[in-house]
A protein has these predicted regions:
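Short aromatic/hydrophobic "clamp" motif used to bind/position activated sugar donors
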Residues: 125
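Conserved donor-nucleotide/metal-binding helix-loop-beta segment in metal-dependent transferases, i.e.
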Residues: 136-162
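Active-site-proximal specificity loops/subdomain of glycosyltransferases
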Residues: 81-116
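Catalytic core and acceptor-binding pocket of nucleotide-sugar-dependent glycosyltransferases
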Residues: 158, 177-274
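N-proximal low-complexity "stem/linker" segments adjacent to membrane-targeting elements
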Residues: 1-32
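Histidine-anchored nucleotide/phosphate-binding helix
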Residues: 38-52
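Conserved small/polar residues in nucleotide/adenosyl-binding loops
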Residues: 335-340
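The conserved acidic donor/metal-binding loop of glycosyltransferases
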Residues: 129-133
Length: 347
C-alpha cells in the first residue's frame, strides 16, 4: 500500500489542454522538480515537442511551487504545440524527513509520487529529470512493450568498475551486471505498484543501516529494489554529459547524431549564462522555440556558481568577466554564509 496517497500529496492541479481529445496512442511523460528547475523543465518539454511533432505526448509536472507567470508559460507552451500539460502542486511534508544532500533536495523523491499517482490511470510513464534536452525521436518509447515482470526500462550509468563498486557498497552482487541512472525511467506502472516499490524505497530511506550505505539516495535504492526486473536499453536515451567537463584540456563528448536525450548532469546547466558551448545548443534551440524565448539565461547567485562561472569565463577567454566573477566568489566567502554551499541541483 502506498505511503503517498493522492489526497495527502496533491494540493492543486492545473490542466492546460489544447489537444481537445486525447489520442489513444499517447506517451505520458512526467517530471518532478522544485522551483530551480521550472525554467529547465519548460524548455525540456519544448525540446520533446519540437522533435516529435508526429507523436501524441501528454506532460505531467510535479512541483512544490509554481508562480502565475510559470503557469502562463506552460499554458502558452501547450497552446503553441497543440499539446496537453498538467501541473501538480504537491505537499512535500512526508518527503522532507528523508535524506538529502547539497546536490539532491527532497525533490529527487517526487518520482515515487509520480509512479504511485498514475496507478490505475495509465499503464506506462516516462519519467525524466528536468535537466535534459531532446534532439531525436521517442517513437520507440511510445511503442515499447514490457516483458513479463519487467518494472522499468533504464539506461546504465558509467562502466563496469562503477557497477562493481555499487554492488559492493550496496551489498547487492547482481548490480555488478548493470547499475542504472534514475534520470530516465520508462515505468511499467502496474508492476511498480504490484511490487510496492515506492513504499519499500521510503522504508529503506528511513533505515539507518541503508542510509549509511547509500551515496546516490533514491537512485541507489531503486537499483537495489529493481535489480533483475529492469531492461537496459540504448544509451541514446540518457546520454549524460557534465558541462563542467569543458574545463578539461581534452573533452570526450558522448553526444552524437544518434543521441535522443542529452542529460546535463553536474552543477552547470544549459540555462546558465556561462554554459556557452556547442553541447548546450539543443537546449538553446528549444528555448528559442518556446514561451521562454525572451527569458535571459541565469546568472550566478551564490559562491559555487560564481566560482564555476569564473572558471568557464576564463576557458572561453572572457578574462575580465572571469576576474569579475572570481571577485564575486571571494566576496561571498568573506561576507556570506553560503561559502560551502553548492547549488541545490539534481545530478
Amino acid at each position: 500500500m502506498s505511503q503517498l496517497n493522492d489526497s495527502d500529496i496533491i494540493l492543486f492541479e492545473y490542466n492546460f489542454h489544447y489537444q481537445n481529445i486525447r489520442s489513444k496512442n499517447t506517451l505520458d511523460i512526467a517530471f518532478g522538480i522544485d522551483r530551480n528547475f521550472l525554467f529547465g523543465c519548460g524548455v525540456a518539454i519544448a525540446s520533446i515537442l519540437l522533435n516529435n511533432r508526429e507523436i501524441s505526448c501528454e506532460f505531467h509536472v510535479f512541483t512544490d511551487y509554481i508562480s502565475d507567470k510559470d503557469k502562463l508559460y506552460f499554458s502558452d507552451l501547450a497552446k503553441q504545440y497543440n499539446s496537453r500539460i498538467n501541473i501538480y502542486v504537491i505537499n512535500c511534508d512526508k518527503l522532507k524527513s528523508l535524506p538529502s544532500t547539497k546536490n539532491w533536495t527532497y525533490a529527487t523523491y517526487f518520482r515515487f509520487i509520480i509512479a504511485d499517482y498514475f496507478y490505475n490511470k495509465h499503464e506506462k510513464i516516462l519519467y525524466l529529470d528536468a535537466d535534459i534536452a531532446c534532439k531525436g525521436s521517442i517513437k520507440e518509447l511510445l511503442d515499447y512493450q514490457f516483458s513479463t515482470n519487467e518494472i522499468a526500462a533504464v539506461v546504465t550509468e558509467r562502466d563496469v568498475e562503477w557497477w562493481q563498486n555499487r554492488a559492493s557498497v550496496l551489498t547487492t552482487p547482481q548490480l555488478a551486471s548493470g547499475y542504472f541512472n534514475a534520470g530516465f525511467l520508462l515505468i511499467n506502472i502496474d508492476e511498480w505498484n504490484l511490487n510496492n516499490i515506492s513504499s519499500k524505497a521510503i522504508e529503506m530511506l528511513r533505515d539507518p543501516d541503508w542510509v549509511s550505505k547509500i551515496t546516490h539516495l533514491d537512485q541507489d535504492v531503486l537499483n537495489v529494489l529493481l535489480n533483475g526486473k529492469v531492461k537496459f536499453i540504448s544509451g541514446k536515451y540518457n546520454t549524460r554529459y557534465s558541462i563542467n567537463y569543458e574545463l578539461k584540456d581534452k573533452v570526450d563528448n558522448p553526444v552524437n547524431d544518434d543521441t535522443v536525450f542529452i542529460h546535463y548532469v553536474g552543477p552547470t546547466k544549459p540555462w546558465h549564462e556561462w554554459a556557452d558551448y556547442p553541447v548546450s545548443r539543443s537546449f538553446l534551440i528549444a528555448k528559442a522555440s518556446s514561451p521562454w524565448c525572451k527569458e535571459d539565461l541565469l546568472k550566478p547567485v551564490n559562491s559555487n556558481q560564481y566560482r564555476y562561472c569564473a572558471k568557464h569565463k576564463f576557458k572561453q577567454k572572457h578574462y575580465m568577466a572571469g576576474i569579475f566573477n572570481y571577485l564575486k566568489y571571494y566576496n561571498c566567502l568573506l561576507y556570506t554564509s553560503d561559502a560551502a554551499d553548492d547549488v541545490a541541483l539534481h545530478c
